């Protein structure tokens, strides 16, 4: 029983940690490409900014769904015997 709880805690930590790393890298790459595109074509800055913020929200939402799943594993453990 203790092994299962330990593995669940490890899995929850990995879900949150790796999800955060992936979201941060994704938003960072997207932000750099937005700045690059805005420097090349300044007249498209407003349209690109809207799309960038929409995609940043979707990336962040995927991370928060992972946090919710990890919290479900941690507090409402479906693997109890």
Curated annotation (Swiss-Prot):
Protein name as annotated: ATP synthase subunit c
TM helices/strands, residue ranges:
7-27, 53-73
How is it placed in the membrane, per its record? Answer: Multi-pass membrane protein
Q: Which SUPFAM superfamilies match?
A: F1F0 ATP synthase subunit C (SSF81333)
Originating gene:
atpE
Biological function: F(1)F(0) ATP synthase produces ATP from ADP in the presence of a proton or sodium gradient. F-type ATPases consist of two structural domains, F(1) containing the extramembraneous catalytic core and F(0) containing the membrane proton channel, linked together by a central stalk and a peripheral stalk. During catalysis, ATP synthesis in the catalytic domain of F(1) is coupled via a rotary mechanism of the central stalk subunits to proton translocation.
Lineage of origin: Bacteria, Pseudomonadati, Pseudomonadota, Betaproteobacteria, Rhodocyclales
Q: Which GO terms describe its cellular component?
A: plasma membrane; proton-transporting ATP synthase complex; proton-transporting two-sector ATPase complex, proton-transporting domain
Which HAMAP family does the UniProt entry name for this protein?
A: ATP_synth_c_bact
Q: Where is this site: Reversibly protonated during proton transport?
A: 60
Keywords per UniProt: ATP synthesis, Cell inner membrane, Cell membrane, CF(0), Hydrogen ion transport, Ion transport, Lipid-binding, Membrane, Transmembrane, Transmembrane helix, Transport
Look up keyword Cell division and say if it applies. Answer: no
The scientific name of the source species is Azoarcus sp. (strain BH72)
Question: What is the similarity comment for this entry?
Answer: Belongs to the ATPase C chain family.
- Keyword Transport assigned to the entry: answer is yes
Assembly and interaction partners: F-type ATPases have 2 components, F(1) - the catalytic core - and F(0) - the membrane proton channel. F(1) has five subunits: alpha(3), beta(3), gamma(1), delta(1), epsilon(1). F(0) has three main subunits: a(1), b(2) and c(10-14). The alpha and beta chains form an alternating ring which encloses part of the gamma chain. F(1) is attached to F(0) by a central stalk formed by the gamma and epsilon chains, while a peripheral stalk is formed by the delta and b chains.
Question: A single Gene Ontology molecular function, please?
Answer: lipid binding
Do you know which CDD domains this protein is assigned to? ATP-synt_Fo_c_ATPE
Where does it reside?
Cell inner membrane
């Amino acid at each position: 029983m203790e092994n299962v709880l330990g593995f669940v805690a490890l899995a929850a930590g990995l879900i949150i940690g790796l999800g955060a790393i992936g979201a941060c890298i994704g938003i960072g790459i997207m932000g750099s490409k937005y700045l690059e595109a805005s420097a090349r074509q300044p007249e498209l800055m407003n349209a690109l900014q809207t799309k960038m913020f929409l995609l940043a929200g979707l990336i962040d939402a995927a991370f928060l769904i992972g946090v919710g799943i990890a919290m479900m594993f941690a507090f409402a453990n479906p693997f109890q015997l």
